[in-house]
Structure formats: structure tokens, C-alpha cells
Amino acid sequence: MILKRTISKEEVKEMPKAAFPGRIHVIQTESEAEKAVAYLQSQAILGIDSETRPSFTKGHSHKVALLQISSDECCFLFRLNMTGLTQPIIELLENPEVIKVGLSLKDDFMMLHKRAPFNQQACIELQEYVRPFGIQDKSLQKIYGILFREKISKSQRLSNWEADVLTDAQKQYAATDAWACLNIYHLL
């Protein structure tokens, strides 16, 4: 497979928008988290991402509000601002039998460790994973554009991830980000 090494913002802008095609489940209680993790533990490979409420004050940051974990069919949006990082989620992150694929995982895990200690296992960093394929770009939007000729919308990135109710646009954005990581891994 011959791939482009890089892609311009202008090229990405002209592409059709990618959207997660599966079911999205918002997880707001510990019992919901337990059921969701039971399903996720049965999967071989998962896409993972997180969202944090943006801070517009220098030196101030918020804890991770949302952890997105996606299979090919379902994406679970764990509202960590409501449930915290529950033991079942920690057990999934530590499970060496379930591969977790994401982009900038070091940053995600650094922020998640502020919620609870854990030792993540079986994680694949896409920025490193795509390098042997000749891809030089490091952003999810550009890597996805190179491989699928579709763009990942970033319009919700700076929205309030701690809102009482997530909008449909937020849910779709969050699910697409986690699923896109999985999609990239499957293709390569």
C-alpha cells in the first residue's frame, strides 16, 4: 500500500466528514460502567480517547471528564466527572489481553492517572504505529485523512465535557475520535 507521507489542512478541509456508524452509549453510573466494561473485556481490540473540559485560565486544568472506548459496533462514553475512574474501568485499562489503540495516549494516561493510579497494559500509540508506513503527520485528523480520505471534525473539541447533558454533536464527536483510532489500526 503506497501512502501519502503528509497532507495539508486545506486537503483535509475539502474531504467528507467521517462519523462513527455504530451505537453510542453514555455511561453515567457505576452499574452502567460495570455492564459496559463486561462487554468491552470480551473484545480483542478497542479504540480509546479522552476529553477534558477546556480551561481558559493559564496554569489551571481540569480532570478528564470523558473516556471514550470503542469497538467496531459500540462506543461507550464514560462520564468520569460523574462516576470517577471505577475499578472495572481500571481493570480494563490494565488487561493485557485487550489491545487499546489511541493517539497521544501518553497525554491521556497522564491525565487519567490524576483520577486514580493504574498500570495500563497492551496499548498501541498510533503516532508511532503509523511511522513504518511512511506517514509523517501526527494528528488524528491528518492520519485519518491520508488513509480514508475523510475528515474528523474537531468542532466540539473545546466544548464543555462536564455539562449535565452531552449534546448529540458532542457524543458523535467523542465516539468518532475513539472509533477512528480503531479504524486506522484495522486498516494498517
Residue ranges and their predicted role:
Residues 126-146:
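Short alpha-helix plus adjacent loop in nuclease-associated cores
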Residues 45-58:
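Short acidic, Gly/Ser-rich segments with clustered Asp/Glu that frequently serve as metal-coordination loops
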Residues 1-46, 115, 126, 179:
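N-terminal accessory regions of nucleic-acid-interacting proteins
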Residues 74-94:
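Nucleic-acid-processing active sites and adjacent nucleic-acid-binding tracks
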Residues 56-73:
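A short alpha/beta connector and helix-capping loop motif
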Residues 119-127:
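Short hydrophobic/aromatic-enriched beta-strand-loop microsegments
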Residues 145-188:
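Acidic, Mg2+-coordinating catalytic module of metal-dependent nucleases/exonucleases
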Residues 95-100:
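Short active-site oxyanion
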